[in-house]
Curated annotation (Swiss-Prot):
It comes from Monkeypox virus. Keywords: Early protein, Glycoprotein, Host-virus interaction, Inhibition of host innate immune response by virus, Inhibition of host interferon signaling pathway by virus, Interferon antiviral system evasion, Secreted, Signal, Viral immunoevasion. The lineage of its organism: Viruses, Varidnaviria, Bamfordvirae, Nucleocytoviricota, Pokkesviricetes. It holds the Pfam family IFNGR1_D2. This is Soluble interferon gamma receptor OPG193. The gene is OPG193. Homodimer. Interacts with host IFNG. Residues 1-17 form the signal peptide. Counteracts the antiviral effects of host IFN-gamma. Acts as a soluble IFN-gamma receptor and thus inhibits the interaction between host IFN-gamma and its receptor. The keyword Secreted applies. The keyword Isomerase does not apply. It is found in: Secreted. GO terms for cellular component: extracellular region. One of its GO terms (molecular function) is cytokine receptor activity.
Length: 267
């Protein structure tokens, strides 16, 4: 009688076995499934075009499980199957290249004597102990990102937006040089072109306050030239002796006129 009761309990449990929730997510090709359900399950995966199921986990309870390396890194669909006794359920995914999300890039600012370098490090996938940048790799869906950087100078509340050209990028990241004497804060976001339509979150903001050994003034139009002339005139007065001031002031005047003429032609 005791054995009959035990068998009955097992039979009842198998009837009520059910996956109550399921979620697949892949960030930078770090792929995980999260699920809830009663009892222990065998979990396997099958890629489109392949007949056999690959066993990933055996007799495991609900939770979050890493399945990186099992789905193909391409556009083919795949299925995840849960089995407990006679109970089976299959979850469908449209394909890793479609589903994968790309995390934010990393922004690095480095000051040099006459300029500041902005380096945008590509998001990367982790394989074992290796970090592999996500940039035009066939085994990562040929994904590459075009970056937009927001520069905030000094006390300005409005950032200056700049689109990074892919010609400024290598397999590790993108690099541009600029100059400023003001504190600058930079954040960057990446986006793909084409039908994949992947957009990263904005990176953490990185700030740098340069040393005052280079004097610059932004000129966007001829209306900015007087401000440039006044600023450089103050530098000449405060940093050079009277003999040098005379020559430099004349040079500043002729340079300002040349810049104004050039900008007028562009207008």
């Amino acid at each position: 009688m005791r054995y009959i009761i035990i068998l009955a309990v097992l039979f009842i449990n198998s009837i009520h076995a059910k996956i109550t929730s399921y979620k697949f997510e892949s960030v930078n090709f770090d792929s995980k499934i999260e699920w809830t359900g009663d009892g222990l399950y065998n979990i396997s995966l099958k890629n489109y075009g392949i007949k056999t199921w690959q066993t990933m986990y055996t007799n495991v309870p609900e939770g979050t499980y890493d399945i990186s390396g099992f789905p193909k890194n391409d556009f083919v669909s795949f299925w995840v199957k849960f089995e407990q006794g006679d109970y089976k359920v299959e979850e469908y995914c449209t394909g890793l290249c479609v589903e994968v999300k790309i995390g934010p890039p990393t922004v690095i600012l480095t000051e040099y004597d006459d300029h500041i370098n902005l380096f945008i490090e590509h998001p990367y996938a982790t394989r074992g102990s290796k970090k592999i940048p996500i940039y035009k790799r066939g085994d990562m869906c040929d994904i590459y990102l075009l970056y937009t950087a927001n520069f905030t100078f000094g006390d300005s509340e409005e950032p200056v937006t700049y689109d990074i050209d892919d010609y400024d990028c290598t397999s590790t990241g993108c690099s541009i040089d600029f100059a400023t004497t003001e504190k600058v804060c930079v954040t960057a976001q990446g986006a793909t072109e084409g039908f994949l339509e992947k957009i990263t979150p904005w990176s953490s903001e990185v700030c740098l306050t340069p040393k005052k050994n280079v004097y610059t003034c932004a000129i966007r139009s001829k209306e900015d030239v007087p401000n440039f002339k006044d600023k450089i005139a103050r530098v000449i007065t405060r940093k050079f002796n009277k003999q040098s001031q005379s020559y430099l002031t004349k040079f500043l005047g002729s340079t300002s006129n040349d810049v104004t003429t050039f900008l007028s032609i562009l207008d």
